[in-house]
């Protein structure tokens, strides 16, 4: 139980000294990505619950710039929060990090003075999250995910909940699965709910900083090499529901709700087993 950034493994994981991604000597080429390898969370037979406000998940509340390999969340019973609620990750990638809602800020001010254009590729690598061989397994009766937040009058804010990642930008997921999912719920006004990823979008520098000089630099020189690092990708990823499973929200889907960007490729499973749900 906590407020923001709540996870069964860690509340927030990111590149070391995120504000130091820009260095007067090394540019953005110098960064230290986080690594999580062979970590397992096992609940009791009747499961465990996680509650919080925003960025609440069975594994990590928030991740940016690193790799996660061979991780499992077992006997999960329920996850509940106001927004960005996920079975494994609440927010993955840059997402809303530059927002004024208490999120992390990647400091790219002065980019036009410090950044060498050939280091744009490194920036893409610095914010990318790679996930492999990771599973979220609910209790026998199934686990529930609920984003309780709702829009105030005149608000356009989105609320997301999902069995794996609530909001994904610049995330590459491979050989990862959700099992024994019972229900996923979000508000019927601006709510996004799904079995695997609620909102999938391309992470970009516009999400990281809003300085006009940065945008003009990007527009003039392009991000051709870095773009590949910013597009989400889901390879051999599946979700399975218990009998009577459900997804309820303004925008809802068995695998994804709002799939703005990304690719899904389950072809390695064979023609009889390549369905994601």
Located regions from the model:
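Surface-exposed loop/turn motifs in large extracellular/passenger domains
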Residues: 1-277
């Amino acid at each position: 139980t906590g407020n923001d950034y709540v996870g069964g493994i860690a509340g927030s994981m990111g590149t070391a000294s995120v504000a130091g991604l820009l260095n007067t000597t090394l540019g953005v080429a110098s960064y230290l990505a986080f690594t999580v390898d062979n970590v397992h969370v096992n609940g009791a037979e009747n499961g465990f619950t996680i509650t919080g406000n925003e960025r609440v998940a069975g594994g990590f509340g928030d991740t940016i710039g690193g790799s996660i390999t061979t991780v499992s969340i077992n006997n999960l019973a329920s996850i509940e929060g106001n927004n960005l609620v996920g079975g494994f990750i609440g927010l993955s990638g840059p997402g809303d990090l530059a927002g004024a809602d208490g999120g992390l800020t990647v400091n790219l001010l002065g980019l036009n003075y410090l950044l060498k254009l050939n280091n744009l590729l490194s920036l893409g690598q610095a914010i990318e999250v790679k996930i492999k061989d990771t599973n979220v397994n609910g209790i026998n009766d199934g686990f529930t995910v609920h984003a309780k937040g709702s829009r105030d009058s005149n608000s356009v804010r989105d609320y997301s909940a999902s069995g794996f990642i609530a909001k994904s930008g610049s995330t590459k997921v491979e050989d990862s699965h959700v099992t024994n999912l019972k229900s996923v719920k979000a508000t019927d006004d601006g709510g996004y709910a799904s079995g695997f990823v609620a909102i999938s979008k391309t992470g970009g520098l516009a999400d990281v900083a809003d300085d006009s000089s940065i945008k003009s630099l990007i527009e003039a020189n392009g991000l051709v090499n870095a773009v590949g690092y910013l597009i989400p990708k889901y390879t051999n990823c599946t979700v399975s529901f218990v009998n009577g499973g459900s997804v309820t929200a303004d925008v809802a889907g068995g695998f994804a709700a709002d799939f703005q960007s990304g690719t899904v490729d389950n072809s390695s499973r064979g023609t009889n087993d390549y369905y994601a749900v």
